[in-house]
């Protein structure tokens, strides 16, 4: 992953923080900025995941642009740890902070928002929250929730896969965490595509919890179980898709069995260019990591009053880009070769409609 757009994050001193009489897990911080400036905090799943590593890079870029202390919290897929680490930062900063969080699971969002409200901090959530939890119920501290509609993109990747298979054959599918909103929506998109394509048979669907290791194990088992019956592999994210590609390489079938993912990470785009994957969807995690902080920071510093913003600024879909063999090279040249240059003041520029709940 030492490639241009995913060189990783700069080294930062790992420090320990105390909360509720116990020591929370380490977080990564950039120190030495003005005491009056709010600390900006990204809470993500893992720095070893290329998607979240790029999210973190965007957060660091925003923090540098405003001269703020930057803290990265890593949950490693542990909800209790994620919530405890955020509460520890709230205690450490006295609430003088902005938090941009991708909750490990939907139920995690509520205690996080409630803790931020109680501490006077400002928070933006992304991807996961309960449907009945809304920013306007926690004014002004719960600034916004950002997501991407998983159904159309899950369906688009299934359709790209089916096209690469010639419209017939068997597929296996790798899903995310069961109670995770994006995982549920992307699976629904897959189901819709399957219903519309009678020539495609779903051989098996297994949850791999967004993890490459689990996806590799499941794909290897499938290759043994189903053999040549597998004509394609659909994965709910790129990490799992790339694990499937790795299994296919070992089996001598990479490039022969198309694979699709979602996230638009560099390795996935490169795999599409090589012909080992058929598609992915780019969310721009650099934008997510930086703009989520920027929205919260602008609210915290008084640039706008969240309570006066329309609901389609409080809960909104961002914009994804479908990448296939037709546009992978041009996307790579425009978005990966060099570090993105974003206007951090354009906080509503990618609003793509208010989130709808079924």
Give the role of each language-model region.
Residues 1-13, 17-27:
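N-terminal secretory signal peptides
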Residues 39-58, 62, 66, 70-85, ...:
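Extracytoplasmic "Venus flytrap"
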Residues 36, 174, 178, 193, ...:
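Hinge/cleft segment of the Venus flytrap/periplasmic-binding protein
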């Amino acid at each position: 992953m030492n490639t241009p757009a995913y060189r990783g994050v700069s080294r930062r001193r790992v420090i320990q923080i105390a909360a509720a009489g116990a020591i929370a897990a380490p977080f990564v911080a950039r120190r030495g900025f003005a005491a009056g400036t709010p600390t900006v905090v990204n809470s993500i799943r893992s720095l070893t995941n290329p998607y979240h590593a790029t999210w973190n890079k965007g957060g660091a870029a925003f923090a540098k642009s405003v001269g703020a202390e930057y803290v990265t919290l890593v949950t490693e897929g542990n909800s209790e740890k994620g919530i405890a680490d955020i509460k520890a930062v709230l205690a450490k900063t006295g609430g003088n902070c902005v938090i941009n969080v991708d909750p490990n699971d939907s139920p995690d969002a509520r205690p996080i928002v409630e803790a931020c409200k109680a501490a006077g901090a400002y928070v933006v959530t992304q991807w996961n929250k309960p449907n009945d939890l809304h920013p306007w119920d926690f004014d002004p501290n719960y600034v916004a929730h950002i997501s991407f509609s998983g159904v159309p993109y899950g369906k688009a990747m299934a359709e790209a896969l089916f096209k690469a298979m010639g419209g017939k054959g068997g597929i296996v599918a790798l899903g995310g965490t069961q109670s995770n909103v994006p995982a549920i929506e992307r699976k629904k998109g897959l189901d819709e595509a399957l219903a519309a394509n009678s020539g495609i048979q779903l051989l098996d669907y297994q949850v791999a919890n967004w993890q490459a290791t689990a996806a590799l194990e499941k794909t290897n088992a499938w290759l043994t179980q189903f053999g040549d019956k597998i004509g394609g592999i659909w994965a709910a994210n790129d990490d799992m898709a790339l694990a499937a590609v790795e299994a296919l390489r070992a089996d001598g079938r990479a490039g022969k069995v198309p694979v699709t993912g979602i996230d638009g990470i560099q390795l996935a785009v490169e795999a599409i260019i090589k012909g080992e994957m058929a598609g992915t969807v780019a969310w721009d995690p650099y934008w997510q990591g930086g703009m989520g902080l920027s929205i919260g920071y602008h609210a915290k510093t008084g640039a706008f009053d969240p309570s006066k913003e329309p609901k389609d600024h409080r809960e909104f879909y961002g914009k994804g880009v479908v990448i296939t063999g037709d546009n992978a090279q041009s996307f790579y040249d425009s978005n990966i070769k060099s570090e993105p240059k974003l206007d951090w003041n354009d906080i509503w520029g990618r609003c793509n409609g208010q989130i709808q709940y079924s």
